């Protein structure tokens, strides 16, 4: 269960779109909610032709950020969680946030995929991406809208889609996903995307084209059946464990060459309002996130995505 939720803010309207989901989770879990804004002290340059930034200017910027945090807390009104605080952190953004997470024993970070930047800069390489690479706690990433967020809204995730690839690494998302879902009486769909079988061509001497085609189809059907049985056994075993905790779980097997496309299609088909997955599965920890299945899902869906980078 979540006990401490942190929301990094950057002073932009985009960054605030993480707040409704964060407060909804914090209220239901009785967790502490921390709003964090990082102040990066401006460097002072000396030398001919250099612009010298006075301490007064830096202090003024710090006060503006502190005032912003206070205004955000006031905007919650009656919807404000019982344990909410705001913190102005100092230093580099990623380092300051990571240090605060370690200090406060934060177990969930909620943030938008991007904040400031021209044309809504892609999240890869942003603070969210860098945090995901450094932290082993889950990050709930929310895509920002074009209008100001309603801080008094109460989003609920009623249906969580959990893609799994059969690896132990991928299964680690089950704990944070179900911890979140239990707060909201969610139902879950465990999805296994299986690549279609591509059997080797049969020995062709003496076979007609029709016989060869029939042989290939028979091999495909046999392999597909074996793959389906394996996936069914795997998902059924996981589902039974979750149902033992009184969770509402269904399973789904899809044959598709491209896993991300299948996940996005299934999210729409089953009416999911949250996708939860590990950043790495069978590819292992050395695999770059760029171009991975989780990366493509995050870019391709407007749904919130709960991601976790597995620790070794």
Q: Where in the sequence are the language-model features?
A:
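Short, solvent-exposed amphipathic alpha-helices that sit
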Residues: 21, 60-72, 96, 176, ...
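Structural beta-alpha unit
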Residues: 1, 14, 74-109, 148, ...
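Hydrophobic alpha-helical membrane-association signature
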Residues: 18, 65-68, 127, 173, ...
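A cross-kingdom feature marking solvent-exposed beta-strand/loop segments within repeated
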Residues: 18-20, 44-53, 89, 95, ...
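Gly/Ser-rich helix-loop-strand patches that form or flank binding pockets
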Residues: 1, 24-28, 98-150, 264-312
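A short acidic, glycine-rich active-site loop
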Residues: 53-67, 213-233
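Ordered, small/hydrophobic-rich secondary-structure cores
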Residues: 28-107
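Small/aliphatic-rich secondary-structure junction motif
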Residues: 1-53, 85, 155-218, 239-252, ...
């Amino acid at each position: 269960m979540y006990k401490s939720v942190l929301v990094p803010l950057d002073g932009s309207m985009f960054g605030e779109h993480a707040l409704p989901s964060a407060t909804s989770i914090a209220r239901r879990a009785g967790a502490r909610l921390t709003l964090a804004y990082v102040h990066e002290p401006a460097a002072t340059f000396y030398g001919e032709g250099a612009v010298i930034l006075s301490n007064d200017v830096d202090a003024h910027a710090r006060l503006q950020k502190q005032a912003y945090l206070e205004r955000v807390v006031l905007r919650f009104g009656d919807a404000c969680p019982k344990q909410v605080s705001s913190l102005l952190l100092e230093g580099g953004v990623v380092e300051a946030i990571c240090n605060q997470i370690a200090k406060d024993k934060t177990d969930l970070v909620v943030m938008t995929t991007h904040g400031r930047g021209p044309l809504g800069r892609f999240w890869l390489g942003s603070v969210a991406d860098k945090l995901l690479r450094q932290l082993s706690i889950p990050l709930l990433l929310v895509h920002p809208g074009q209008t100001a967020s309603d801080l008094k809204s109460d989003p609920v995730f009623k249906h969580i889609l959990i893609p799994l690839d059969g690896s132990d690494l991928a299964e680690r998302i089950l704990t944070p996903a179900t911890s979140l879902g239990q707060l909201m009486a969610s139902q879950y769909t465990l999805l296994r995307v299986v690549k279609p079988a591509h059997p080797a061509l049969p020995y062709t001497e003496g076979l007609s084209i029709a016989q060869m085609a029939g042989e290939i189809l028979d091999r495909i059907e046999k392999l597909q059946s074996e793959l389906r049985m394996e996936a069914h056994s795997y998902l059924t075993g996981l589902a039974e464990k979750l149902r033992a905790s009184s969770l509402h779980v269904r399973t789904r097997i899809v044959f598709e060459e491209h896993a991300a496309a299948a996940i996005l299609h299934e999210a729409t088909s089953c009416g999911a309002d949250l996708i939860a997955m590990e950043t790495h599965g069978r590819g292992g920890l050395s695999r770059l996130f760029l171009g991975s299945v989780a990366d493509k899902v995050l870019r391709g869906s407007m749904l919130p995505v709960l991601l976790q980078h597995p620790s070794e």
